[in-house]
């Protein structure tokens, strides 16, 4: 017997939607949603396709996700071509199977089943879908959220279908995310010949004590919901490639994943004070890709936990670790935001796959959340 969730997931995987190219995925979803009474508003920005769809009125539960995927890598190393979905030993293989076309299929089928059972549901059910989450994320969910906020759209609850689970579907629910702040720092020196250091000013030597102190700072101890803030140097560049030239500049890029114990302004101030302490000549640029957010126990978390306990008979962990997601933008609307999706063990990897039975289970969980919040 065919399964509508698996069939839709396979149809989506066949569309090679390398970010930000949607490759027809959203048209497929929109067709299904319009067929059950959704109003669909395309919101394209630049090279990115997005849509906002809704059905009903009042208290709003949105399902959010992305149709874009990362590159497949070496296709010859896949057990099957990455955009030709195949099922082996109960596992659905294909780029995007876990991140996150499987979730998208589960959302749409859950909505179809929900509307069939509750054609006159009391609340509003919505979808917020983008084709730019894996790349720059500049013309995707953030732009849709800005548009919705400008016209005072209501959004009470949002379930993001990111692959949150680690071993079995539903074992982990993300009810928040750390903030992400990147510093692009250039230390200025004076280029010269290595044999005449008194005629130059080596920026690497100048920066070394400051960087040593920077990496040893304990920024905070975290709290009940967040691990301690982490700072990692990601890139260091200096020199001409020649062994007889003292470099004129040194570029250092570092990233903070920060908890609710700090603000981005507090981090910036401490870094600048450190630069001043060591009397460095510098240029600095900051990129804040997201503030930390947290959804405490409430209607959405309770509904998601209840759905998982009902179908998988496990109590999920509520965690905030891992990378950022589009939930950071949606949280700006004042919505309760959680992430629930399939197992993430193979995301972005060669032979990405997801248990086909997990997608069927996920669709049931999503439907139960709908029933608890907007039926």
Curated annotation (Swiss-Prot):
Tree of life domain: Bacteria
GO molecular function: acetylornithine deacetylase activity; cobalt ion binding; succinyl-diaminopimelate desuccinylase activity; zinc ion binding
UniProt-annotated binding residues for Zn(2+) 2: 99, 134, 348
GO biological process: diaminopimelate biosynthetic process; L-arginine biosynthetic process; lysine biosynthetic process via diaminopimelate
Pathway: Amino-acid biosynthesis; L-lysine biosynthesis via DAP pathway; LL-2,6-diaminopimelate from (S)-tetrahydrodipicolinate (succinylase route): step 3/3
Cofactor(s) in the UniProt record: Zn(2+); Co(2+)
Binding site for Zn(2+) 1: 66, 99, 162
Assembly, per entry: Homodimer.
Protein's job: Catalyzes the hydrolysis of N-succinyl-L,L-diaminopimelic acid (SDAP), forming succinate and LL-2,6-diaminopimelate (DAP), an intermediate involved in the bacterial biosynthesis of lysine and meso-diaminopimelic acid, an essential component of bacterial cell walls.
Protein family membership: Belongs to the peptidase M20A family. DapE subfamily.
Database matches in NCBIfam families: dapE_proteo, PRK13009.1
UniProt name for this protein: Succinyl-diaminopimelate desuccinylase
């Amino acid at each position: 017997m065919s399964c509508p969730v698996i069939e839709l997931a396979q149809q989506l995987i066949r569309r090679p939607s390398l970010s930000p190219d949607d490759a027809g995925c959203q048209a497929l979803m929109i067709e299904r949603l319009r067929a059950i009474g959704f109003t669909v508003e395309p919101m394209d920005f630049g090279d990115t396709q997005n849509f906002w769809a809704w059905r009903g009125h009042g208290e709003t539960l949105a399902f959010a996700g992305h149709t874009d995927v990362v590159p497949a890598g070496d296709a010859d190393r896949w057990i099957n071509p990455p955009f030709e979905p195949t099922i082996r030993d109960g596992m659905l293989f294909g780029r995007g199977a876990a991140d996150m076309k499987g979730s998208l299929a589960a959302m749409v089928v859950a909505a179809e089943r929900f509307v069939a059972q509750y054609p006159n549901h009391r609340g509003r059910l919505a979808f917020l879908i983008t084709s730019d989450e894996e790349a720059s994320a500049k013309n995707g969910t953030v732009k849709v959220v800005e548009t919705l906020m400008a016209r005072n759209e209501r959004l009470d609850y949002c379930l993001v279908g990111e692959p949150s689970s680690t071993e079995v579907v539903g074992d982990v629910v993300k009810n928040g995310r750390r903030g992400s702040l990147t510093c692009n720092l250039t230390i200025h020196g004076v280029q010269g010949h290595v044999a005449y250091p008194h005629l130059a000013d080596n920026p690497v030597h100048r920066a070394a004590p400051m960087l040593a102190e920077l990496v040893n700072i304990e920024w905070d101890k975290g709290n009940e919901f967040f691990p301690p803030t982490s700072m990692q140097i990601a890139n260091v560049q200096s020199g001409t490639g020649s062994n007889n030239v003292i470099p004129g500049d040194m570029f250092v890029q570092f990233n903070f994943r920060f908890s609710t114990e700090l603000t981005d302004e507090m981090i910036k101030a401490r870094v600048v004070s450190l630069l001043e302490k060591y009397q460095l000549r510098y240029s600095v640029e900051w990129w804040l890709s997201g503030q930390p957010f947290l959804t405490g126990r409430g209607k959405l978390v309770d509904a998601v936990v209840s759905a998982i306990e009902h179908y998988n008979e496990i109590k999920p962990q509520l965690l905030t670790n891992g990378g950022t997601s589009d939930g950071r933008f949606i949280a700006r609307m004042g919505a309760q935001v959680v992430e629930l999706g399939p197992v993430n063990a193979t995301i972005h990897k060669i032979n990405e796959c997801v248990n086909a039975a997990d997608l069927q289970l996920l669709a049931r969980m999503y439907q139960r959340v709908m029933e608890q919040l907007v039926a």
